[in-house]
Design a protein with these regions (language model features):
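Residue-level signal for inorganic ion chemistry
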Residues: 20, 49, 68, 107, ...
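ATP-dependent carboxylate-amine ligase
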Residues: 1-29, 45-50, 60-63, 143, ...
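Short, hydrophobic beta-strand segments that form beta-sheet elements in well-ordered domains
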Residues: 37-38, 72-79, 193, 248-251, ...
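Short internal beta-strands
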Residues: 70, 74-80, 249-252, 394-397, ...
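Short, conserved loop/helix-junction motifs that constitute active-site signature segments
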Residues: 69-71, 87-89, 206-209, 239-244, ...
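Phosphate-binding loop of NTP-binding sites
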Residues: 103-252, 256-267, 513
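N-terminal leader/targeting and accessory segments in enzymes
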Residues: 1-106, 255, 282-284, 304, ...
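Acidic, Mg2+-coordinating active-site environments of NTP-dependent enzymes
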Residues: 82-88, 201, 210-366, 443-446, ...
Length: 514
């Protein structure tokens, strides 16, 4: 795939400030301007943009207006505080409103024309774990059917084969609408979006209407933002309203999925892995090894869909089943989907970066890199690898700083309960003391009687130590970094690849890496 820095439509239309002001309820000052794009930071400004200057944690966006204008911005949208810093004689085209952030979706939709009829089908996925995997599986299934596709995930964004970098689970509203506009002009048939609860709270999905919204699961996470599971579910539930989506598919493997489905005011299809759970569709794994899984899906009228994919674990199969049902709910015939997958024998042609991704080859130990950063994700990954491993399971784990600290002891306890050896290391500390983060994981891990627990701060040394412990028949899994290409240390993005480090450790130990 090709790579590009800034994701924008190439044949955009323009909207004048005089048109935009009443849409936003904003006051217009200075001359008019023809706006062709929207930017929130100076690094993403393209000539013809309106620069949106918001209040940040440490500074106001208006402080960077000069840099935005030098980059090609034609106008600025800001709040009263931002406007007050400008000279009364300023000739900069200006829109002023009370809360510019809440209007980003309205502005971007108007500028990029994404509300027009005839756009691609939009598939949005939310939940605690499995969002990224489900989006990649959706995209792979659509591509197998011959569709032009686009996706937006934590790992990357892609439109019709061109990749763009990703820094947020769900981009800001201007970036989403720019992507949808580019998808439309690229004749894309289906777009798969990863949607976080934080994005819904911050209006990033405003004026984005999904064809189908999918729910994976809900477990303890992000209490720093939501405080309780009930509040967390409420934030996710905002996606499943008449204003946001046409229909829903909900996995009921967790009680929170059952609760969400019961509250739906839109058409909903339910899915579960256990026949003990009431659902319209059920999935069952029929075959699994270190390389792939095969499963059956049975519908309410006895419909059967058999699929295969290079994924591991019941949790990943649940994601794949959810993706398939989202497509079926959008109008795709079961036979069409089945035929695209080679009748179920060839499988879903998917590569999911950093999600139980195997980096080893040959007859040596199995080594995986995963993005798990919650107790529930640890449990699913470790239980899967335990079933597939004849020898020992060695786990390297760390977690993010400046995030929910209450989950860390729980994660550590799960790790030490299910793995034979646990090595706690640094991951993505952000502005938190890495030793404090490790201490939270170690507290839980060391509470398990007889647990073999090590603390190695340097992640490169941690993975090398893990590989030194294993032999053929054993498994190493490094949970946390996934496909991330950097570590956030005191606000600085330091280039780093866990996958590259794991491969290097394997080769240096005399094993074969992928």
């Amino acid at each position: 795939m090709a790579h590009s820095a800034i994701l924008r439509p190439t044949r955009g239309t323009s909207r004048s400030l005089r048109e935009l002001a009443p849409l936003l309820g904003a006051s217009h000052h200075g001359p008019d301007a023809a706006i062709t794009g929207v930017a929130l930071n100076t690094s993403s400004v393209v000539a013809g943009d309106i620069f949106v200057a918001l209040q940040g944690l440490n500074s106001h966006g208006i402080d960077h207006l000069e840099a935005a204008l030098e980059a090609g911005a034609l106008a600025v949208l800001t709040d009263k505080r931002g406007a007050s810093t400008l000279s009364s004689s300023s000739e900069i085209p200006l829109l002023v409103c009370e809360d510019p952030r809440s209007l980003l979706g309205t502005l971007a939709s108007a500028v990029y024309g994404t509300a027009a009829e005839g756009g691609p089908r939009i598939f949005s996925v939310t939940g605690t774990n499995g969002k990224t995997s489900t989006v990649f599986l959706l995209e792979a299934m659509m591509r197998a059917m011959g569709w032009r596709t686009a996706l937006s995930t934590t790992a990357l964004r892609q439109v019709n084969g061109v990749e763009y970098s990703s820094t947020l689970t769900t981009p800001e509203a201007p970036d989403i609408h720019a992507m949808l506009a580019l998808a439309r002009e690229s004749d894309v048939s289906g777009v798969a979006l990863e949607v976080s609860a934080q994005a819904l709270n911050k209006n990033r999905l405003d004026h984005v209407r999904s064809t189908v919204a999918g729910f994976t699961n809900l477990s303890h996470d992000h209490f720093e933002d939501f405080g309780t599971m009930e509040n967390y579910l409420e934030a996710k539930a905002a996606l499943f309203t008449k204003d946001m989506t046409d229909r829903a598919v909900v996995c009921c493997d967790t009680p929170w999925g059952v609760e969400l489905a019961s509250r739906m005011s839109i058409p909903v299809v339910t899915l579960a892995g256990s026949m003990d759970i009431s659902a319209q569709w059920h999935y069952e794994i029929t075959q699994a090894d270190h390389e792939r899984s095969t499963w059956n899906m049975v519908g309410p009228a006895g419909q059967v869909l058999s699929l295969s994919a290079p994924i591991l674990g019941e949790h990943m199969v649940a994601n794949a089943a959810l993706a398939a049902l989202m497509l079926i709910s959008s109008g795709v015939e079961i036979d069409t989907l089945k035929a695209a997958m080679g009748g179920g024998t060839e499988g879903v042609p998917v590569y999911i970066p950093g999600r139980v991704e195997k980096v080893s080859q040959g007859s040596g130990p199995q080594v995986y890199v995963d993005a798990a950063r919650s107790a529930d994700a640890y449990e699913h990954t470790l239980e899967t690898l335990r079933r597939l491993t004849s020898g020992a399971v060695v786990m390297v784990c760390g977690t993010s700083g400046n995030r929910d600290a209450t989950k860390r002891p729980i994660m550590g306890k799960v790790a030490a309960t299910l793995a034979d050896v646990v090595i706690v290391t640094d991951d993505d500390p952000r502005k938190e003391d890495p030793a404090v983060i490790r201490a939270g994981l170690l507290e839980g891990a060391r509470s398990v009687v007889g647990a073999k627990v090590h603390e190695i701060a340097d992640p490169s040394e941690a993975i090398r130590f893990a590989v030194s412990l294993v032999d053929p028949g054993d498994t190493v899994v490094w949970c946390g970094p996934g496909s991330q290409s950097y570590r956030d240390i005191q606000g600085v993005h330091v280039p780093y690849s866990a996958r590259a480090q794991a491969r290097s450790a394997l080769r240096d130990a005399g094993w074969t890496a992928s």
